[in-house]
């Protein structure tokens, strides 16, 4: 029996099983088996087989944004509209057959935009577009491009496909610590009341993955799925921005409704509507900061920003400049919102904020 058949068999058993207190452990175990099989489905079938053309695009720039959506929703047109890249466009499906990169230049940052081929329903199970769905795992932000006339249906299907390949949209990893040991059995502790998980459930799932010795500390009321995600260890938690195209084909009331949805932008490439706002929202969702450097005794250099992730420390700023600079640091001077006074003398662990000016002093 193949992996797909096993998946279908478990899914059928889960549908047949009535959800109640008596069956929750059995269902939890089935979910664990299902997650393991789906992970196998994503593994390459042959180590020596040829790689899909256009899917191994070298990651460049300060961040990567993946365009994902069904065929002919306007991904290629959008890429051409907000970058200098000309991606083939046509009114028929499957115009883009490989991953096409472009660069969005925004306030000193270079953001790589990746136009992935259109996916179809069942892509996560290998029915078409599985490479595109998997390639989205490498992104720092997913831009889900949806046809405004079919928005709800397309969004639901794409979210399902991404969920199956281990992508968790607009979520944080569960606040749980799992430490695998060599002996000592399973130790289960939690700091909050749990309504979905208990020791027996955790024990059953860990044994399914052949983990027999571990310390578990749970700090939030997680679900069984959250715990399986933690055990799998290969989930990607990625911000997603929903981009509704072809809004000229729906009513003004529908445009207004879509625009008010969380993390959503309505656009029209034909009318060049809201493209600048889309760029602004992409920047916000990427959680990037612009940091400026200053030599001792000179004015800050505001012509070229150093792009770092939100929450970055002076150590990471040093690494962005040169990989050995952090080792040579004596101290840093910081001006800006992260400094208690200007300038503040700080060390490697100081967290920088947007617009900070930094002077690095070496030993």
Curated annotation (Swiss-Prot):
TM ranges: none
Keyword Nucleotide-binding attached: yes
Keywords: GTP-binding, Nucleotide-binding
Domain TGS: 287-362
Record GO terms (molecular function): GTP binding; GTPase activity
Domain spans labelled OBG-type G: 63-287
Positions annotated to bind GTP: 69-76, 115-119, 246-249
GO annotation terms (biological process): cytoplasmic translation
Record bears the keyword GTP-binding: yes
Domain of life: Eukaryota
GO terms under cellular component: cell tip; cytoplasm
Family matches, as Pfam families: MMR_HSR1 (PF01926), MMR_HSR1_Xtn (PF16897), TGS (PF02824)
Family to which the UniProt record says this protein belongs: Belongs to the TRAFAC class OBG-HflX-like GTPase superfamily. OBG GTPase family.
Protein name: GTP-binding protein 1
Organism: Schizosaccharomyces pombe (strain 972 / ATCC 24843)
Gene: gtp1
